[in-house]
Amino acid sequence: MHLKYRSFKLHKVVSEEHSKVQRAWSTMAGLPDNAWPLPLEFAPDERSKRRKGAHRPQFAKVWTQPGVTLSRPVAAHVFVNPYSGRKKGDVIAHEVCERLEQANVVTTVHRSNAPGHLVELAREADVPPGAVLLVVGGDGSLSEVITGRFERGSAADDVFGIVPGGTGNSQAHDLAIHSIDDAINTVLGGHVQSLDIGKVVLTEGLPGHEKEPIVRYSHNLVTWGLGVDSTIKAERMRWMGPLRYDVGIVMAILANQRRTAVLEMDGVRLEDDFTLLLIQNSQTGGSRLPLAPGASLDDGSMDIGILKSMTRRQIFRAFGMLKAEGRHVYHPRVDYHRFKTLTITTAKPTAINVDGENLGSTPLELTVLPRAVRLMVPP
């Protein structure tokens, strides 16, 4: 079914039964079963102060299922992005290896020498049972290692760990792993949760430099539209550190180019002009921005914030609300949904960002793989 966008502002709370609630409301509203689903809305956290005209939304639990505690790892294969975090990856990895060796954990280091190299290193690594694949870097580095293990066919049997060494470190932030100390204690604690993964099929290369289709496995986020434009601009200003994300967003807002796409979400089709699509597995992204307050890492679905076509003034307000603890979900031009499958097609190739890396272009196909990998987390 081909639809133009219709927005229905219904006051309901994000819950595990959201799909049943949506169907019930659709019936009451006289919509067909295959109509574009009604947007989810958030209950306000009335304990918070009102900012930007709204309370902070109630955030979902990061995990919906209990984890398990395994034996302490006997070995760690440490995958290092030396260029992450203002080129501090090697220094962080050296300290991590020293401290793990002191705890009688044998370490093997795999050092990347180019973007995408961690995929190859992870695919080729012989990791024995009882070892952890420990990633020193940011969200993109973890994505590369997970992708490499999927290509090897071993991802379901592996155990992954994170040492925050990138610029944003969104996944580590959501897991409360903020330092080397936190990462070491997490590894030695042996507590593991199962993490949803997004299987992303897209065209390699940014617009104008397209190659063949590739597959990447996303643990954090996928973005299309203004957000990708801003990160492309931000990558040219890496010397600015995290501030580059804010500068990039302002530059992209001022440009405010028109973006038309066809979305198909869980089999329902929609064509419209959009400002930004925020597709999230975790709650934060970029420089730890609260992009998806309703996201959980193991609920078998991913969340999407749809920022519809906006004026520059509306965009600035929406981003101000976003930075104010995720209040953008209350903006009248923002709708929030949850899905298991999603496609994005455009008349011309447009850029896609996966886990903080500008990897390719549309068309895009995304399928959620429920609880597909195991990740070490604080107890």
Residue map of PLM features:
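ATP/nucleoside-binding phosphotransfer catalytic cores, i.e., glycine-rich phosphate-binding loops
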Residues: 25-30, 53, 59-63, 265, ...
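Glycine-rich phosphate/pyrophosphate-binding beta-alpha loops
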Residues: 223, 227, 278-293, 358
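Short glycine-rich anion-binding loops that position phosphate/pyrophosphate groups of nucleotides
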Residues: 84, 138-141, 165-168, 224-226, ...
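Catalytic core of DAGKc-family lipid kinases
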Residues: 103, 112, 150-275
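Short acidic/glycine-rich loop or secondary-structure boundary segments that cap or lie
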Residues: 227-230, 271-273, 285-288, 312-315
